[in-house]
Amino acid sequence: AAVSNTILDWAQQREMGFSYFIALGDSLDIDVDELLDFLTRDSKTSAILLYLEHLSDARRFVSASRSASRNKPILVIKSGRSPAAQRLLHSRSGMDPAWDAAIQRAGLLRVQDTHELFSAVETLSHMRPLRGEKLMIVSNGAAPAALALDELWLRNGKLATLGEETLQRLRDALPGSVVPDNPLDLRDDASSDRYIKAITILLDSQDFDALMIIHSPSAVAPGSESARALIEAVRNHPRGKYVTLLTNWCGEFSSQEARRLFSEAGLPTYRTPEGTITAFMHMVEYRRNQKQLRETPALSGNLTANSVDVHRLLQQAIEEGATSLDTHEVQPILGSYGMQTLPTWIAGDSAEAVHIAEQIGYPVALKLRSPDIPHKSDVQGVMLYLRTATEVQQAAEAIIDRVKMTWPQARIHGLLVQSMANRAGAQELRVVVEHDPVFGPLIMLGEGGVEWRPEEQAVVALPPLNMNLARYLIIQAIKSKKIRGRSALRPLDIAGLSQFLVKVSNLIVDCAEIQRLDIHPLLASGNEFTALDVTLDIAPFIGDRESRLAIRPYPLHLEEWVEMKNGERALFRPILPEDEPLLRAFISQVTKEDLYYRYFSEINEFTHDDLANMTQIDYDREMAIVAVRRSGAGEEILGVTRAISDPDNVDAEFAVLVRSDLKGLGLGRRLLEKLIGYTRDHGLSRLNGITMPNNRGMVTLARKLGFDVDIQLDEGIVSLSLSLISTDKQE
């Protein structure tokens, strides 16, 4: 209530209205995801502002947020980042980096405090969408422009570079004391006329994506006079309604009237240069999150895994009472998912360690094997670069003696012997998977250390990952200095590390028994990534294996090989984000008439965003099944059927489309039958669709499959409806 009243009070002073202002309290009757679904469908709502303390269902929240953010911007402020704040709020809201990962993955924008919140609300209320990230700054003084530049630099923003034509026009139009550059300092004697000349020239150019105008109190150009002139110039310029504009009229009393004028004109205005940059970077971050949400992932190559063998190994270990597996035991598990580990042998004592070292060759590494000591370094339990039998024997005895002295209660299960990895020019990384109480498994990337503090040392992502999401995580880690972008000799192979992270993600998605995974160090050497030391914590898992994940993974169990009438086989499978190029090629082989039947309008071309929305789906709310055939060039899509359910998972709208040259092979029927089976198993009650009266093939197929067919000639449509509830359940 306190935050709500603060926002309302601020909005009243700003004369800003809300379509709805809803406080959920303890969410006993309605939850955040239901509210998001309602506001997404509401045409009066242009942007959504959320204040959150906790979540009751992370998966439903992420699902609803991803759906809503495709249509309108959503701002989130999350309290309870510190343990003390969580105690005050009586909430167990999970790790703060997990919230960042979920908010970014859903395409939302997080603000950190109420000051940023009000700034962002101002931005969303008035600012036009960004088309890029390059900022142009105009000011009547160097000092405020410098403050803006510093804040832009701190936030990794981009400054626009003016073209030579624009620079020359500015030289010709402005006094010699004004140096054409970015920022453009019009000097403290700048009149309203000088402002308008410069801004008109800039509006004529295409050199920037957003324009920030700073005005410091001046007797030469009073604030309200300059504001009126600017509003008029922007309104009259052909590009005025397309340019992203931010205004910063500094001061308080002398700028009140100017800020009121900007607000009435629908132009965002801020009190300080730093606040203006913060608002701009909010929109940049939001744009990046949305771009990430729609970017087509690269193919990840052959990432097949023998999950059956891995499940057997994990189950066997659990039945034997194991709760933690070390590098030697984890080796076949990671190997089944294509991850390379350093060959490891177990030695019972120093003599056996020497024997193994003689067999594999020097130098070797020797490591303690104990389930009771979480960090080997606590007892100096790792000895490297041992080059002789004497060194191995002495190191082994020293490790065991130290444990007996410092950890007398610890069990010693021998020693691990490894060939010494070639670390020359290599980079040491750390990949950790931990379970968050709210969002489930989290994948963390950093360089780590003995005291692992993921909030400070790592970037975090939610599984499942594809190549794009993994690449974004790595770039985020480099930019935030959690990892280095190169070793002493070579740059980090981002594509190779992305593939490794995707493999880790696949392992975690497949194996609910895994409670924690710690790969430290992961040695990055060129395009090779080798796990030197691994710890895997396991426990029995009972229940729905997918329910522990905040995002539903690819439903592999729906894949099915189907024989067509011509004897060829096609793979029926859920659509993937990587299918965008295949879907574009498929649509190019569908006639305009068939596309008109499907979309009820003439389709010239689908944009990238259109295709991204069709391929990057939320499997909890939507299902698209494609029929795929192997061809010389790889794969090709032969047909697709789709069902989009309502937020309550009661009804779903369906459609089906087959390549025009492949009709008569039974593809449409087989695809629709599979979709009916899926929606029924998914708990839906009814499947609905619309087609045209002259689409006789679809009408006939619907009748054969038991749909109720309602031909409405006056409306020019045919309504199709199928009950998915069995007669027994209805009775």
Q: What residue ranges belong to the model's regions?
A:
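Catalytic-core regions of core metabolic enzymes
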Residues: A1-D533, F541-I542
